[in-house]
Regions:
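Signal peptide-proximal N-terminal region
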Residues: 1-20, 139-143
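Residues that mark the start of a beta-strand
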Residues: 19, 115-116, 171-172
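Short, well-structured alpha-helical segments in soluble
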Residues: 22, 29-46, 106-107, 156-169
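Extracytoplasmic ligand/sensor domains, especially the bilobed periplasmic-binding protein
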Residues: 30, 44-148, 197-215
Length: 215
């Protein structure tokens, strides 16, 4: 984003200079709302872009819509951001989690041949929507869901859940959530002897996942 702004300014095509104002939403809806309110209160702000975290985006889009500030979502993938509210000034360049879960489901069932799954999802709007997306997709392809467990964001000890899941002997464990909880689950799967495939969509794609979960 910063590179695009610098290139636009260097091109000489525009009779003005574009300035980027970067604020940290901390992947927290309340922090994101505070940042959005700060931006829309500045008359020099003409457009905005964000977020990585879906619950944050779902909290801020109403502010940008109310203040008529065009808003482009670059990372958050909850479908309701654009699919439910349909604010004309809110658009996305990222796919939705439904679009991500489809190919993932095709791969793990169609290509790997796995049929029995345990699901762990967090209780955020992002996690709940992943559960709602993946489960019917998998069952529609003939898969069996052996267990579903919901966890709060910030949970650090998943061993009781994983020990139960180990006894069910699924082919794989699907996770609907983001980096830290996903990494801890993957790490603790090894520690309880649950040597099965762990898989999820792009919410876990971060160097921190590999750092915590290990190879």
């Amino acid at each position: 984003f910063d590179l695009a702004i610098r290139e636009a300014n260097a091109s000489g095509k525009y009779p003005y200079k574009v300035e980027m104002v970067a604020l940290d939403d901390a992947s927290d809806p309340a922090t994101g709302v505070a940042a959005a309110l700060k931006l829309v209160s500045d008359p020099a702000v003409v457009a905005a872009s964000g977020h990585w975290n879906s619950p944050v985006a779902l909290a801020t889009i109403h502010i940008f819509h109310t203040y008529k500030i065009p808003f482009i979502v670059w990372g958050a993938i909850h479908p309701d951001i654009t699919g439910f509210y349909k604010y004309p000034g809110v658009n996305r360049v990222a796919p939705t989690l439904i679009q991500e879960n489809g190919p993932l489901c095709d791969w793990v069932i169609g290509e790997l041949g796995f049929k029995n799954f345990s699901i762990i999802s967090d209780t955020s709007s992002y996690g709940e929507m992943n559960l709602k997306a993946f489960r019917p997709m998998a069952e529609g392809k003939g898969a069996k869901i052996l267990s579903v467990d919901s966890v709060t964001v910030g949970t650090t000890d998943f061993r009781p859940i994983l020990t139960k899941v180990k006894g069910l002997n699924p082919d794989a464990v699907y996770f609907g959530g983001v980096v830290m909880e996903g990494a801890l689950i993957r790490d603790q799967m090894e520690k309880v002897g649950l040597k099965k495939l762990f898989f999820a969509i792009s919410g876990i794609k971060d160097d921190k996942f590999l750092e915590v979960a290990g190879p």
